[in-house]
Each structure stands twice: as C-alpha cells, then as structure tokens.
C-alpha cells in the first residue's frame, strides 16, 4: 500500500511529491492538513478528505472528450470520524483558467487550497452527486467569473437538479460514471442513466478533469479517457 499524507506547507509542491505508481498521474488540491491519499490493490485510489479536496488528473483533454471511471463513497460501521458520512461524489471536467490561458488549474492550487468557493475562478462543468449531506444532485457550468469567489450573486446557476432518492448516493456502492463533451453536448451518465444532457452554446473545448469531494472517504478506480481533436 502506498500512502501520501498531506500538510498545508507542502500543498504548493504536491504535484512533485506524488511519486508512487498511479499517483504519478494525479495532483492533489487539499484544504486540510489531515487529508490522505492512498493507493490500494487493483489500482484503487483511496481518499480521506476531512475538508474540501480536488484530485486533478495531470493531462489536459481537448476536443470531443469522453471520460470514464468507477467511484464510491465508503461509510464504515463504528467509525465516529466526521468524514465517515455519505455525501459528495463530485467532479469537474473540461476545467481551465479562462483568464490565464498559459496556466493550468494546478498552478492555482496555492490560491484555491481546495476551498470550494475558490473554484468559481475556473471555467468548467460541475456535477455534485449526493451533495449537501446527500440531499441534492446538481449540475452547473462555471464561467470563470472570479467575483463569484466572494459574491454569491455571481455564482453559476443550477442547470439541473435532482432530490429524489434514486438520484442520491448509496453507501459503499461502486458507480460507473461517464462524462462527455461532444460537439457542445455535455452529458453525465451514471450506471447507464443519462442524468445530465446539456447543449452548451459556448462549449469548453479543452481542460482538465478533477475528482471532487469534501468531508468524506471516497475511492476511485479504472479511470480512462479519449479525445478526438477538433479541426
């Protein structure tokens, strides 16, 4: 088992510290010094996030993009830790710094530090599955308006929302997730069900994937993606 313990003073150096196997492909943006990221057998990445965390995939995706992976929230019996709860199996995709084209999201890690509201400075698609203590599933398109960091009036609208139990989390259950951005049609597909289909009038043509969670114990495995360049 490979383990990485994070602390606040190394957050800015984190991409250079992920040396073990599968973690070479990822960078961690974490709010808490108690965060841990662990590799388990079968290429599972195990995440304990006492506060906000984004696990960024290091490669930029461009053009028509399909991303697939399995993920779950782990809830253990007889564990009183605050993060041992069923909530927040979230993700960002096609994320970029729209105001600084030369920068990747990783360069903004020291500024954002895993804090959720600071992600509003990025342009991206966001799906929060089982957020707000597993009461909502919501889709948004972030515009990169940095005013949203401090002023809720400038934050992106909820474009699609579910609150029924069929679209909320089940504990310890592996979901298969497929994200698409194809010719401006953005889809989120979970276990074969299309729960988001959004035609973006100004689609995001390139960016990065980030697995997002907070106050939870999450796991991710079998991550793959394909891109077809646009000409």
What are these regions (language model features)?
Residues 4-13:
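Sec-dependent N-terminal signal peptides
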């Amino acid at each position: 088992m490979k383990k990485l313990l994070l602390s606040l003073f190394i957050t800015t150096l984190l991409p250079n510290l992920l040396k073990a196997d599968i973690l070479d492909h990822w960078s961690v943006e974490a709010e808490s010094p108690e965060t841990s990221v662990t590799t388990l057998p079968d290429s599972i990445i195990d995440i304990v996030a006492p506060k906000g965390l984004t696990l960024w995939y290091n490669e930029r995706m461009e053009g028509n993009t399909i991303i697939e992976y399995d993920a779950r929230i782990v809830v253990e019996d007889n564990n009183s830790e605050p993060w041992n709860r069923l909530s927040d199996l979230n993700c960002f995709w096609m994320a970029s710094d729209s105001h600084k084209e030369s920068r990747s999201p990783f360069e903004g890690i020291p500024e954002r530090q895993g804090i959720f509201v600071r992600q509003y400075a990025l342009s991206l698609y966001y799906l929060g599955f089982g957020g707000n203590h597993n009461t909502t599933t919501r889709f948004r398109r972030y515009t990169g308006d940095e005013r949203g960091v401090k002023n809720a009036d400038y934050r992106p609208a909820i474009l699609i929302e579910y609150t029924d139990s069929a679209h909320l989390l089940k504990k310890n259950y592996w979901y298969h997730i497929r994200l698409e951005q194809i010719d401006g049609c953005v889809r989120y597909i979970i276990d074969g069900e299309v729960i988001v289909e959004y035609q973006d009038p100004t689609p995001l043509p390139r960016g990065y994937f980030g697995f997002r969670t907070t106050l939870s114990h999450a796991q991710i495995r079998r991550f793959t993606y394909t891109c077809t360049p646009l000409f």
